Amino acid sequence: MNLNIEQVVAGKITPPGDPQASVAQIAANPGTNPQILRKIATESDWELRRLVAGNPNTPTDTLWQLGVDFPEAILNNPIFQLLQLEQLNLVADIPHSTLTSLLQCEGVPSNFLEYAVERQDYSLWLAVAYNPHTPGKLLENLARKSRAQDRELIRAVAAHPHAPTHLLAQIVDIGSNVAQIVAENVQTPVVVLDKILGKYGQINDPIFTTLVALHPLITPRLAIGMHLAPTESAAQSLWLAKQPATISTQLAELAATDWNILRLAIVRHLNTSKEIVEQIWEQMSAIHTEGSQMDRLIYNSFVNNAHTSAPIREQLRKLLKW
């Protein structure tokens, strides 16, 4: 039987025994002719292409083409494991753009990550750094490869949840921009946060004091001991505002404050109501300093709250120059 994409899209070609099959069913059916799958892969329909990417009967070259947009589907495709067994150095044969996408996925084989780190290829290094499951040892290797004049790689390492404590403690010395990312990493331990405060906490922009105070590991006792909160009561309020289980009525009560760090903690909370977000916006919008890091932190806190209203978002677009 001669098969073509026009017939498939028109619904005139179906798998044997299933006259009611849709094009999507054809794309997902492992018994579909590989050449038909190759043709469906050229369609603009996103879902059809995703289904072809997950089909074990899809030709290998077509899989690699689809892997740029559908890396998870490729990794979950049963044929992928077979290809690894058949080709011991499979990773070296995968097109660069496809490999870059695969490296950022949770299910990518560990030997792929190791291969990429050993290449002299900056885009592959970045892909590995952006994978949230990259182990600490590889992150250390990436940090050593990072160039001082291009800090995107070291920033990705600084934000990584698996970055080892000793590595974080080292890279905060690179500069304030890297230290800021480390301070925002929720996995950064207190000992590193304390180092950041000691090194950068005295600058005019209060960004580091604020970031450390907002960190989930900073308890009321630590907030007082590190001079991050004005009073014990304020430290307790900040701790409550950082707890995921705190309800909207409690957050509304906490909002009756003139302490900006507590206000930011409230704005960042998922349970803060639209009314409280607007109230705090009115309170804080009058105190910004054009272009400061603290301003950007404030604005991004509002951007990331789903309850921020459209009028406020319009103001934020202008302030952040979106």
Give the residues covered by each predicted segment.
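Alpha-helical scaffold segments
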Residues: 1-322
